Amino acid sequence: MSEIFEPKNIIVTGGCGFIGSNFVHYVVNNHPGVHVTVLDKLTYAGNPENIAGLPEDRVELVVGDICDAELLDRIVPGHDAIVHYAAESHNDNSIADPEPFLRTNVEGTFRLLEAVRKHGIRYHHVSTDEVYGDLALDDPAKFTEETPYRPSSPYSSTKASSDMLVRAWTRTYGLRTTISNCSNNYGPYQHVEKFIPRQITNIIDGVRPKLYGKGENVRDWIHTEDHSSAVWDILTKGRMGETYLIGADGEKNNITVLRMILEAMGRDPEDFDWVADRPGHDRRYAIDSTKLQRELGWRPAHTDFAEGLKQTIDWYVANESWWRPAKEATEARYRAQGQ
């Protein structure tokens, strides 16, 4: 194992988004000596309420764009590391309009790497298992760090591009970097456009949930707090230049997840509508996190998916004021796409 890195001041890009804000909460709750600067553009998916109430002497919000090189030159000095979560990440949006994905996911990563190169700090790159493409439903294989890249959507192709930039800058310029590729996250603060919160909030509103295709597509679910603990372990204990896959053996097909949500909310498990499948919808994702567990000793804490799902449902029921402002615009966008 590498020498343990003990950062005192870190930048978290996208720290007002779903996964990024949960990482900020994790750091504040578990590592009291660390100060976090959140850099977030506050797009539709970034909500400052996600980090409201955290101690002001521990967390500072800088509203800005990761593509702004002058801004990065001002805020990066004095920090020990950047943890890069900021991304355009919704597949349906990438199909409708890929340009913002290229700018944020590719150019934004380039700008951050240049800032890291200039100021000599560490960098952890948060990525997705979607860069590997998909697996057959009857294939027992899982993605590993050696799986070839086969991105199949505008979103995943931009994330694959950003991963390659990190590797190239690491090799060419000697940057101190790590990369993680994670499976599908669930938990609090996730935007209502995403699969699980969309179903939950539709049921709260008395609207029949909608399911793509035949519902057979499989996702490997992980609670976002487990993702956060894994990223921290990789940042502080990971070997420089290495990639680690993060997963919790949470494979479920979409129809199973939807039926679990319906039953947990007291509804008939068949009370949903079928809609046309997403173009190019990946069939199955599955992560093998053996390397992460073996080298760094990481283990997921939220291994009961049904319990984690119940806690997530309870959070959305209790926090309608958080998700309500985005709900109508999100559903209008889905209606326009026939979904």
Residue ranges and their predicted role:
Residues 99, 200, 219:
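Short alpha-helical segment that forms part of, or immediately flanks, the ligand-binding pocket
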Residues 140, 151-158, 188, 192-196, ...:
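The catalytic Tyr-centered alpha-helix of NAD(P)H-dependent dehydrogenases
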